[in-house]
Amino acid sequence: MKDYKRFVLTVTFAVWLSNSHAQQLSYTAQEIEFIHDSINKSRWDIGGRLSQYTFRYMSEFFPVGVIQKSSQPYQFPNNPKKSFNSIIIKSKTGTLSLDDYLKKLHIASFIVVQKGVVVYEKYFSMLPDDKHTLQSVNKVITSTIITSLINEKKIDVNQSIEKYIPELQGSDWQDISVKDILNMRSGMDNRSIDFETGPFTNPLHKNYQLESALGILPKAETTPSSVYKYLIGLKKDTVPDVQAAYSNINTFVLGWLAEKITGKKYADLVTERIWKPMGASSDAYVCLSDQGIAWPHGGMSATLRDLARFGMLFTKSEIKARNESLVSFAQIKEIFDAPPLTNSFAPFKWAYQWDLANDGVMMKGGFGGQALYIDSNKEIVIAYYNYVDKDWGMNIISDSAFSEIMKALTMDK
């Protein structure tokens, strides 16, 4: 009987998986059972429709720390722009409406906020109350905690990291500035997106060792027993501040720094410094290791509206209203003034953990197609969630699609 049940589940799920780009809002108990039975806990990122589920329900697969909502949530006014109905996106195969274009990319949800008002909002394969993984978009939440501590004079961005984390004294981290870590220029031997070296598949890779120690990836013989001892033992492979190299380890150290300075857990820091003050309407959460260690480089999950609300903190009016406490105009200028990379990762910058800052727009992306765009002066925020393909494609919207959206925002005045 048990074998027959397994056969039925297998056939049913094979049909379900056959359309990996299908958008699905709800799941039967049978589908959920098979998902949990099929996914090794640490390979939730396998891609396709399995990841469509895990990206939406990370708390079913990992321990989490709760990030508490505000008692006075921000109420988004709604004023849909008619101009969005006429947006046409050109592609290699023809033209598509905005809705059809987003569906083709299997976007889970998409929101556009202008001057604090929702002008476009669609949910394709998640619900408004769902808490979707941010992946690396989480990095700019971590860097915002750091900028708030800098603005409170609790951290000197030019000071060496071991001054704040004594455990790093005598290690290769010694004499590396907080600023170099913020800007992905620490020089430490870890590159998280040099995919040919296997950062997520090769147990000998430094990133794999970090993430397996946190429970993100499957444990191997090379998995460290202590993530902190592992970080202390890392070596440099370049001189700090010479070359940017995208590294999850840098962001993890920033999270460690924030916890060390304040004596508080990461989830509580996000709650107290960002989520409650900004008027979050829903609790969020951050995934934890089995030892209760947060993933500050990509472990958060939140509703789409709360991600957009976070983005609003970087608009000109919000920075002024908060007296530059979370982020200052000088820090925004540093992000835009940072030189773009000159290697294969151009035009990325990774200044203060942000990927891009050009033509007035800041952007941060995350694995699988999460993204946050902010035009501070025009008071525009665009945010969306997606899930990873079986080939780990990112499915970020194209520059031309972004341009058409920005163009539509100047209409209907």
Which sequence ranges carry the predicted segments?
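Active-site helix/loop module of the DD-peptidase/beta-lactamase fold
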Residues: 151-194, 233, 262-298, 302
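Structured C-terminal helix/loop/strand segments within mature extracytoplasmic catalytic/sensor domains
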Residues: 23-42, 366-413
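Active-site-proximal alpha-helical segments within enzyme catalytic domains
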Residues: 184, 250-257, 296-320, 370-387
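Bacterial Sec-dependent N-terminal signal peptides
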Residues: 1-26
